[in-house]
């Protein structure tokens, strides 16, 4: 019932108060009828639904005109409706206002019923045709408002929860996060192949039964489940008590010193054993001569015989211990000789491998993340490569990598890379000082067809000490670059893979320098004698 109809029904003879009373009663009846019919109609919105739906909270381009703005939520009209008094509202906003604040227009307080609202399809079409910006951070696309919902479904910058850790990420980042960064991503133990979440791996590594651990006494590497038996039975340097500790010897020594201890303290052990036998003898004597116990009579004929047998056995065991000690010392000498032989053979194998590289050596530096962390904590990091030869015969060289500290002057946070000459097998047959060209390269480990290696080429300078024949195993003077590569460039590229950095050194002596020259590299100045 409109206000106009209410005024006409009142008549001129009635007072204004009677008119208002009739109008209020009519409105109350209309609200009651409308509320009943609304409960069965799908066109009306539930209160909980209306609380969630307001206007379009998006950024318009150009900015939204005020005529399309809802006076209640101050956002763009959603499902625009118009009142008899000519005002526009979001459908959900005005229905909620009527039900919460009373049957009146929020703008001019005119009487307003729900059944008086009618859709403003013209405004709806106009608003849906306006251009808006995607609200997702990083997305620069613009589209009509009617297409925004479909765009957000496929937008690569929309936030979605990681299915494993439930943290929000943009769609374009979630796959990388799941594979590389998610604390709940599945990883396998390299030792026992058990699958677990990444965040649980550190705890698992501390208790994995198949993980390699180092014996704290002898340095032997064993799997964790073997370590208890190793401590109890095998470890040569594990501390153990004397065999005669039960008789009163309180000495503790390494297991490999036990035989010597037994040999050097035989007399002491015999005295302790005799004292223990004497104490047993006293314990077996009757405490009361008037009422001797039959079970502990000293005149038992087998008692003294048993003591004699035990003493005889002790003498034999003492001789056996001496013999075993002598054998063990002999075997220890053999083992020492075998260890020296093995060490010599290992050195020869390493020397032969170094001679096979023919002047091209790739140095694999593992656990490089640990070295970077040490550098960030301002702990010096200096690493030397194994030696390698330029040929057979050839010069023996090695590389030195130094991570400069953040506080270093003029070279802070740089990788310094140098080459050192070493004493080699063929030094007496080679011309000195060393002359040639050296190419140093940090390899790009990406899968790209064209890899962006970082490399420098330098010529040897015979007048420097770095290229003279070394008089000690490794020449203390090096030749190379203090500022070979900045650590920031290293981190931004794909130079580190599986926590490993690859450094390549290619050496051409004065007899085969043509290969490097043909590639057009011009050496830059180096930092000599560092």
Curated annotation (Swiss-Prot):
Residues 358-507 form the MATH domain. It catalyses: S-ubiquitinyl-[E2 ubiquitin-conjugating enzyme]-L-cysteine + [acceptor protein]-L-lysine = [E2 ubiquitin-conjugating enzyme]-L-cysteine + N(6)-ubiquitinyl-[acceptor protein]-L-lysine. It is an enzyme of class 2 (transferase). A zinc finger (RING-type) spans 70-109. Sumoylated on Lys-124, Lys-142 and Lys-461 with SUMO1. It comes from the Eukaryota. Pathway: Protein modification; protein ubiquitination. Keywords: Coiled coil, Cytoplasm, DNA damage, Immunity, Isopeptide bond, Lipid droplet, Metal-binding, Nucleus, Osteogenesis, Repeat, Transferase, Ubl conjugation, Ubl conjugation pathway, Zinc, Zinc-finger. A zinc finger (TRAF-type) spans 150-202, 203-259. The keyword Transmembrane helix does not apply. One of its GO terms (biological process) is protein branched polyubiquitination. There is a cross-link at residues 124, 142, 461 (Glycyl lysine isopeptide (Lys-Gly) (interchain with G-Cter in SUMO)). InterPro entries: MATH/TRAF_dom (IPR002083), TNF_rcpt-assoc_TRAF_met (IPR012227), TRAF-like (IPR008974), TRAF1-6_MATH_dom (IPR049342), TRAF6_MATH (IPR037309), TRAF6_RING-HC (IPR027139), TRAF6_Z2 (IPR041310), Znf_RING (IPR001841). Residues 1-362 are annotated as: Interaction with TAX1BP1. One of its GO terms (molecular function) is ubiquitin-ubiquitin ligase activity. Disruption phenotype: Abrogation of IL-1-induced activation of NF-kappa-B, MAPK8/JNK and MAPK14/p38. Animals appear normal at birth but become smaller after one week. Show runting, failure of tooth eruption and die after three weeks. Exhibit severe osteopetrosis, thymic atrophy, lymph node deficiency, splenomegaly, and have alopecia and lack sweat glands. It is found in: Cytoplasm; Cytoplasm, Cell cortex; Nucleus; Lipid droplet. PROSITE patterns: MATH (PS50144), ZF_RING_1 (PS00518), ZF_RING_2 (PS50089), ZF_TRAF (PS50145). The keyword Protein biosynthesis does not apply. The coiled coil domain mediates homo- and hetero-oligomerization. The MATH/TRAF domain binds to receptor cytoplasmic domains. Homotrimer. Homooligomer. N-terminal region is dimeric while C-terminal region is trimeric; maybe providing a mode of oligomerization. Upon IL1B treatment, forms a complex with PELI1, IRAK1, IRAK4 and MYD88; this complex recruits MAP3K7/TAK1, TAB1 and TAB2 to mediate NF-kappa-B activation. Direct binding of SMAD6 to PELI1 prevents the complex formation and hence negatively regulates IL1R-TLR signaling and eventually NF-kappa-B-mediated gene expression. Binds to TNFRSF5/CD40 and TNFRSF11A/RANK. E3 ubiquitin ligase that, together with UBE2N and UBE2V1, mediates the synthesis of 'Lys-63'-linked-polyubiquitin chains conjugated to proteins, such as ECSIT, IKBKG, IRAK1, AKT1 and AKT2. Also mediates ubiquitination of free/unanchored polyubiquitin chain that leads to MAP3K7 activation. Leads to the activation of NF-kappa-B and JUN. Seems to also play a role in dendritic cells (DCs) maturation and/or activation. Represses c-Myb-mediated transactivation, in B-lymphocytes. This is TNF receptor-associated factor 6. The gene is Traf6.
